From Swiss-Prot:
Its cofactor is Mn(2+); Zn(2+). Its EC number is 2.4.1.12. PANTHER family: X-BOX TRANSCRIPTION FACTOR-RELATED. Binds 2 Zn(2+) ions per subunit. GO terms for molecular function: cellulose synthase (UDP-forming) activity; cellulose synthase activity; zinc ion binding. PROSITE patterns: ZF_RING_2. Disulfide bonds: none annotated. Zn(2+) 2 binds at residues 52, 55, 75, 78. Belongs to the glycosyltransferase 2 family. Plant cellulose synthase subfamily. Expressed in young plants, stems, flowers and inflorescences. It holds the Pfam family Cellulose_synt. Keywords: Cell membrane, Cell wall biogenesis/degradation, Cellulose biosynthesis, Coiled coil, Glycoprotein, Glycosyltransferase, Manganese, Membrane, Metal-binding, Transferase, Transmembrane, Transmembrane helix, Zinc, Zinc-finger. This is Probable cellulose synthase A catalytic subunit 10 [UDP-forming].
Amino acid sequence: MVAGSYRRYEFVRNRDDSDDGLKPLKDLNGQICQICGDDVGLTKTGNVFVACNECGFPLCQSCYEYERKDGSQCCPQCKARFRRHNGSPRVEVDEKEDDVNDIENEFDYTQGNNKARLPHRAEEFSSSSRHEESLPVSLLTHGHPVSGEIPTPDRNATLSPCIDPQLPGIYQLLLLPVRILDPSKDLNSYGLVNVDWKKRIQGWKLKQDKNMIHMTGKYHEGKGGEFEGTGSNGDELQMVDDARLPMSRVVHFPSARMTPYRIVIVLRLIILGVFLHYRTTHPVKDAYALWLTSVICEIWFAFSWLLDQFPKWYPINRETFLDRLALRYDRDGEPSQLAPVDVFVSTVDPMKEPPLVTANTVLSILAVDYPVDKVACYVSDDGSAMLTFEALSETAEFSKKWVPFCKKFNIEPRAPEFYFSQKIDYLKDKIQPSFVKERRAMKREYEEFKVRINILVAKAQKIPEDGWTMEDGTSWPGNNPRDHPGMIQVFLGHSGGLDTDGNELPRLIYVSREKRPGFQHHKKAGAMNALIRVSAVLTNGAYLLNVDCDHYFNNSKAIKEAMCFMMDPAIGKKCCYVQFPQRFDGIDLHDRYANRNTVFFDINLKGLDGIQGPVYVGTGCCFNRQALYGYDPVLTEEDLEPNIIVKSCFGSRKKGKSRKIPNYEDNRSIKRSDSNVPLFNMEDIDEDVEGYEDEMSLLVSQKRLEKRFGQSPVFIAATFMEQGGLPSTTNPLTLLKEAIHVISCGYEAKTDWGKEIGWIYGSVTEDILTGFKMHARGWISIYCVPSRPAFKGSAPINLSDRLNQVLRWALGSIEILLSRHCPIWYGYNGRLKLLERIAYINTIVYPITSIPLLAYCMLPAFCLITNTFIIPEISNLASLCFMLLFASIYASAILELKWSDVALEDWWRNEQFWVIGGTSAHLFAVFQGLLKVFAGIDTNFTVTSKASDEDGDFAELYVFKWTSLLIPPTTILLVNLVGIVAGVSYAINSGYQSWGPLMGKLLFAFWVVAHLYPFLKGLLGRQNRTPTIVIVWSALLASIFSLLWVRINPFVSTTGVMSNSFMGE
């Protein structure tokens, strides 16, 4: 039985005589201190010093005082908090206790008076009704006192008599080790509701959501985050307590790193304001146009920096606990309670996305460390290519050998191409004697599999005149990729074969949605929405994970990492997706074109994780299916608090421990009625369906659901399955027919698909728009960075391919900027946090920076050619302002690299490509976006090539591919080089006094050239040759600009020229 004390915030349990009793207090005399080794000693009154009144742990007074002042303030043995003894100095926690005046006398036992004192103590706790009625006890339930009394022995055996052999007839109260309890926490979170732990285990699952929400919230706040073991109920009770702990935690960056960083940011903001004030109030009269252009550019750069900087104010890391996830949902010997997950793989063109790459991704999914009956892999072939279909059939056969090999030897990664290409000691930690033999055999099997795939690829190079035919002689339905029916093929799963060990494999399903002329297909977003519907009809996983065809599972536990957040009752109900960072293979050593995007993934997204969560980056993301359906999140009052800067400066609105967390059952009803963001709630639909009393009302409800989700009763029924799985009323024989129906080209007509549900249409970068809509409804997202990267993919290392990729991203941002979903004006009545909105605004306006950036990069050349400058002669004070500005810029960069652990080279590559992309791809995106939105001139979607290098490592890096994107940066390079030559020539002709002003102009020009240096190397290529067409066009433009500027120099007065000409004559 458990009893409690409200005033002392602790519980005790009585032992019976079968337990090992604690030592009588009289035996403590002569004990050795268990910390320092000295004698325990006596008090001032000559009695044995007892540090802990609960267990009598031997501790001398010096160690006792040290532990209370500088230590944990708890007994090392029983973890009970030390009480203050008379004469001991007070510590902070003593202020909350009752005054202690006679602690020593209360336990002042000596050899001569034990008999006089112990009977009195025993009488106080005897089982007589007189004493029981006078001893009220308060229990704690959710932080509220509940009065109670110690029951009589015949009712509940409150006290177990343990007779001291030296004191016959006297009952001694034996206490368990005591833990200090937080009165605001539920007792269930400590595992101390019932002595019978077996009963608690049975009732645990019914109470887990309620308790975990309360407990995890306190855990993240650092209140009660450490849970001590009971030490008496055995390993089973400890296992139950461990299973109830949060499955993840927030790891804040050290304040020693963040505080200087924030101080420098504030100082930089102040210095920037002073600098801009100086620049705007000190024009250059003889170069007014150049000065005005430079000031406008600098003001925009300052605004752009603010948009980028503020969301990085409060970065965080996260840590997951896979062992707790297993204890809670996936115990050995019991059916797994992990949620079902549907994995989406999207591909379009097998010529640019090689089937072998897609096959490796699929194999890594099928071999993932997750219950096979909980995983389904859907491959979307939006190009309806028979090559993809046949390659997937070969992949399904090979997986029957590959999957058991991976699981038997627990290898990583589980994509065979990348596993066998690892240059590591593959025998490390592999103790099975059969491993080497089986690995060699598996490698031979994989080489044969590659040969079969390559034969299919070679065969697909020449398309037959009559189109492709299948093995049974029938025509391939997808011969016309723009006009074909929907196709679904289940390769593995319940209807497929078993692996070589006789075990079931995850489902593998091929899907190609229907396409017909006259229907808008919305590219990748439309294909993903088709996968949402077909997966809901066939498997209906509670969570969805999407990856590109070239992003394989590098960590077989990636899904479990995501489930640590998604299945956590405290945050899972309000988490729309878990985003993993993108990591890449096959990038050159120096990452010439910043393909790794390290600054974005390791700095920007960690900053957003401390606000409302990272943006969705298009791949490597695990979604909550309910969030994609447009439903409302389950929010608490904490989620509606001010933005993080206000919270950091002025504190939270919470008021200590007395704050009450809203009840879990009430959270689902939290909605904003005045929001212009469509918000749906599961309970609303339940009421719609169950609350009607007549068939007419039910018909109206059905029409509303069809208007939202489309005319598929099976799919609509699946949307109500919040935990996944198919409804019990579903007829398996009709599922494939219904699946074909939901991927038909006209299914989305007059529904909310692409508007409020699923992937959102309206931009080629559908990922940004989809994540923004979820955040606007109040959902949060999580950034998960496991120690072993979850996914790895390929990136375009060729300059032209890289620029085309950046062009597509920038074009999508411009489309969102000019749409109704623009974060500048959309969803202000929703639940999007201020700093999150600023981050989204920065995500869509960054291409506009290309215009001032282009102008700013041309300024050094014009200054050198015309012998003018954008800054007037400056005083010492102005010089100090400039030096402080540059110092603050570099100081903030260095401190940012320090807390993020990003390498300096990665940061510099990012800065260089910001200029390269800004003066090329971003500039083109602005004009293409304007033409597309206002003139209706659409641009073709270009799939980035994922083909691997066949001519050697990084051969693709040196291949030149012509694109008009190369012209603007090349022109900037040539103009600045011409300007440098002109400036030096002028200084040589003008004498020594002209070299001083020249230095500032040369530094300005070299700053531009240094940022464009990787671009210059890309132009030269392996043979150090630049294509003639690029040289001709760039030289022509540079010459035109230079001659035109010299001919109509606006900074030299016409009268001056005329006068000089006259005098020369």
